[in-house]
Design a protein with these regions (language model features):
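Hydrophobic, often amphipathic alpha-helical segments used for membrane interaction and targeting
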Residues: 2-72, 90, 106-108, 112-115
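C-terminal structured interaction module
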Residues: 75-115
């Protein structure tokens, strides 16, 4: 992202830290629940289409081009941020559309200690 957009995003967080923290907390909670619909809903309200294209969708397409050949050869673990998991342009959908089997890894996320 251009530095001007990064700065604007940072300034929004500084101007409204409670809102930024609440949005972050909601996203983390949805991620821990593996609630993809909630993640998609939260992200749709937090980022515009142009931002999502640059930060999520273009990167998902680039990763797909690299991952598909590798995943056809062997099993691969892919770890990405929550925004890359959802929607019609999400990484799991793109990989499935390429004929690959995709499944989440089970387990529970550890809660961070308070005050750290």
């Amino acid at each position: 992202l251009p530095i001007s957009e990064q700065l604007e995003s940072l300034m929004e967080s500084v101007r409204a830290p409670e809102a930024a923290q609440a949005a972050s907390d909601s996203l983390v909670a949805a991620y821990r629940r593996q609630d993809l619909a909630a993640i998609e809903h939260l992200l749709a309200h937090e980022m515009g289409q142009a931002y999502a294209e640059r930060m999520l969708y273009a990167r998902n397409r680039a990763w797909t081009a690299v991952l598909v050949p590798e995943m056809r050869r062997r099993s691969v673990l892919v770890a990405v941020g929550a925004g890359h998991l959802v929607g019609t342009q999400g990484l799991p959908k793109l990989l499935r559309d390429a004929g690959l089997d995709v499944s989440p890894v089970g387990g529970s996320a550890r809660q961070p200690e308070q005050g750290r």
